[in-house]
Amino acid sequence: MKLTLLRHGETEGSRRDLYYGAADIPVLPEALEALRHKALTGIYPTAGHYCVSGLQRTIQTLHAIYGDVGYTVLPGLREMDFGDFEMRAYAGDLEHDPQFIAWCEDVEHNICPHGESAAQVLARSVAAIEPVLRRGEDTVCVIHGGVTSGLMIHWFGGILYDYSPAPGTGYQVIFDGEKPLNYTNIG
């Protein structure tokens, strides 16, 4: 089975280096157009099944790349809820926030105030992707950078920065049953 994980297209949040996970912000119009053109090159794998997290940026990206295909919404693949840090930038804002500084001491385990921890996001992401793997059908999931990174670390080891896909890029993972064998970069 081939499982393709693609990060949604560029948003105002990614352009401004904001912490945005739960915020349902759109892909920039020019980024959608760039994805449409990139898709014409054939760089994106196709599949028999498509999934999104349900946030508009994932649905917009799916349609920009694959057109009007049917899809399944898997809310468990939504990005981390940064709680009180949502839609805020580090520079000039969060760098002075004592709660943010405390969270940064262990971002993998500390919970964002009124949000989630990376461990909580990984647990729900793994639970959400397990039925897809059990089905065994080639699948494309248009999701989020943090979720993609977490799943890749879970399957292949490493650290967050080993698997931080840029908008519109990702990985194709080859599975034998539910066992990940290897991966290639997409985009």
Tell me what each language-model feature is:
Residues 2-69:
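Active-site-proximal alpha-helix that buttresses catalytic centers in soluble enzyme cores
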Residues 3, 48, 136-146:
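Generic beta-sheet signal
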Residues 11, 147-148:
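Short active-site segment of divalent metal-dependent hydrolases/proteases
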Residues 24, 76-79, 167-170:
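Short, acidic/turn-prone active-site loops that include or flank metal/cofactor-
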Residues 52-53, 123, 142-143:
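Short beta-strand scaffold positions
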Residues 64, 150-154:
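Active-site signature of alpha/beta-hydrolase-fold catalytic machinery across serine-
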Residues 65-124:
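Phosphate-handling substructures
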Residues 158-184:
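Domain-level recognition of soluble alpha/beta enzyme cores
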